[in-house]
């Protein structure tokens, strides 16, 4: 028997995943974000690899090595800013991707959804550790504040913090291990993405109607490959505009000052994509309570399949639930704004109200509204 190219095991996998994959005929542009995240991950891996070739993970030379990359390495500034702003794009797409999953009820694919939440945690950990590497003021103090949160864990907390630091403060050992983890985690994320896709292809993709689409499937290529390429084109235009015109727009000016353990910046804050969680953390006066609220604000995503009480899967035909969904989005934008503000009146109160509202919408309003919609539709 002659060996056709499609009988090769590797080509077969690619073929079943990206070419002959049966896809619903009505999936909208919201479904583009999965492929955009894949491209973002590839871009981050590549730019990160080139940065690692010139970076030194030592407290005395880390800051200078980043400066050296920007000044002396051929197109080093481009690689550095593509990596920094690529992370911002990554999180924008992540939040859109999760939002799409909530809106269209994709969380009913529990295996895919849960590995997705774990992926979110892994990406957040990677981004946090990457932010520490340039060893600027905000890198150092961000690392100090966030790692210190673990000391709120009863009994083992303080020991755990010192164990993570590798000493009695954030220092050389901390920077070295953060670089090691920041380098290895994206490869673990890539493996998790493959598992994420494996679980998705077990069930097939969801679609905006939320109904079974087995009766109306089309091949992924050429229909959705072209659609994805258009999305990638838009992404690259946005990213390159950001990199070329305003590369520091989303960064913190404090990070252009080398780390100084003796001088605390007036406002310690993380990158913009963590501000909503940071606002929730700060809104609770108790340290342990704040840490629990912070963790639960992300872990709550795992409860969506359990809290789903509607007889319909998608929100496409549920106007009341749609209103709540957009209320949740507005609430998250308010939290993001508050996270970047100083801890003073009226921001403290606004942050506390927004934090309570966040949990209230997800845990109480959404499930009860879904039940009410069932009643209104006499289901």
Curated annotation (Swiss-Prot):
Protein name: Cytochrome b
Gene Ontology CC terms: mitochondrial inner membrane; respiratory chain complex III
Pfam family, one: Cytochrome_B
Positions with a binding annotation for a ubiquinone: 201
Further remark: Heme 1 (or BL or b562) is low-potential and absorbs at about 562 nm, and heme 2 (or BH or b566) is high-potential and absorbs at about 566 nm.
Function according to Swiss-Prot or TrEMBL: Component of the ubiquinol-cytochrome c reductase complex (complex III or cytochrome b-c1 complex) that is part of the mitochondrial respiratory chain. The b-c1 complex mediates electron transfer from ubiquinol to cytochrome c. Contributes to the generation of a proton gradient across the mitochondrial membrane that is then used for ATP synthesis.
UniProt xrefs under SUPFAM superfamilies: a domain/subunit of cytochrome bc1 complex (Ubiquinol-cytochrome c reductase) (SSF81648), Transmembrane di-heme cytochromes (SSF81342)
Database matches in InterPro entries: Cyt_b/b6_C, Cyt_b/b6_C_sf, Cyt_b/b6_N, Cytb/b6-like_sf, Cytochrome_b, Cytochrome_b_C_euk/bac, Cytochrome_b_N_euk/bac, Di-haem_cyt_TM
Domain of life: Eukaryota
Positions annotated to bind heme b b562: 83, 182
Name of the gene: MT-CYB
Species name: Ctenomys porteousi (Porteous' tuco-tuco)
Cofactor note: Binds 2 heme b groups non-covalently.
Keywords from the UniProt entry: Electron transport, Heme, Iron, Membrane, Metal-binding, Mitochondrion, Mitochondrion inner membrane, Respiratory chain, Transmembrane, Transmembrane helix, Transport, Ubiquinone
Intracellular or extracellular location(s): Mitochondrion inner membrane
UniProt GO BP: mitochondrial electron transport, ubiquinol to cytochrome c
């Amino acid at each position: 028997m002659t060996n056709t190219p499609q009988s090769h095991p590797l080509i077969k996998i690619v073929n079943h995943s990206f070419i002959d994959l049966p896809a619903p005929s009505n999936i909208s542009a919201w479904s583009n974000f999965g492929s955009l995240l894949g491209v973002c991950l590839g871009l981050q891996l590549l730019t990160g690899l080139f940065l690692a070739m010139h970076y030194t993970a030592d407290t005395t030379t880390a800051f200078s090595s980043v400066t050296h990359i920007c000044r002396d390495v051929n197109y080093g500034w481009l690689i550095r800013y593509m990596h920094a702003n690529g992370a911002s794009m990554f999180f924008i797409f992540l939040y859109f991707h999760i939002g799409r999953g909530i809106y269209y009820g994709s969380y009913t694919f529990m295996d895919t959804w849960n590995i997705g939440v774990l992926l979110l945690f892994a990406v957040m950990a990677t981004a946090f550790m990457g932010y520490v590497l340039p060893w600027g003021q905000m890198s150092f103090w961000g690392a100090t504040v966030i790692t210190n949160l673990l000391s709120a864990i009863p009994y083992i907390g303080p020991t755990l913090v010192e164990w993570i630091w590798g000493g009695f403060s954030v220092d050389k050992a901390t920077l070295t291990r953060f670089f090691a983890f920041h380098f290895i985690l994206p490869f673990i994320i890539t493996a998790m993405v493959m598992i994420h896709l494996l679980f998705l292809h077990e069930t097939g993709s969801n679609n905006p109607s939320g109904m079974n689409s087995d009766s109306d499937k089309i091949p992924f290529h050429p229909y959705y490959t072209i659609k994805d390429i258009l999305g990638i084109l838009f992404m690259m235009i946005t990213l390159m505009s950001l990199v070329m015109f305003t590369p520091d727009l989303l960064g913190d000016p404090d990070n252009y000052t080398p780390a100084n353990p003796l001088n605390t910046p007036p406002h310690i804050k993380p990158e913009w994509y963590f501000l909503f969680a940071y606002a929730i953390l700060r809104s609770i006066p108790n340290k342990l309570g704040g840490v629990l609220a912070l963790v639960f604000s992300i872990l709550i995503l795992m409860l969506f399949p359990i809290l789903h009480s509607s007889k319909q899967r998608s929100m496409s035909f549920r106007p009341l639930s749609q209103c709540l969904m957009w209320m949740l989005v507005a609430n998250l934008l308010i939290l993001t704004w508050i996270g970047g503000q100083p801890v003073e009146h009226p921001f403290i109160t606004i942050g506390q109200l927004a934090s309570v509202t966040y949990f209230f919408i997800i845990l109480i309003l959404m499930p009860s509204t879904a039940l009410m919609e069932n009643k209104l539709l006499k289901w």
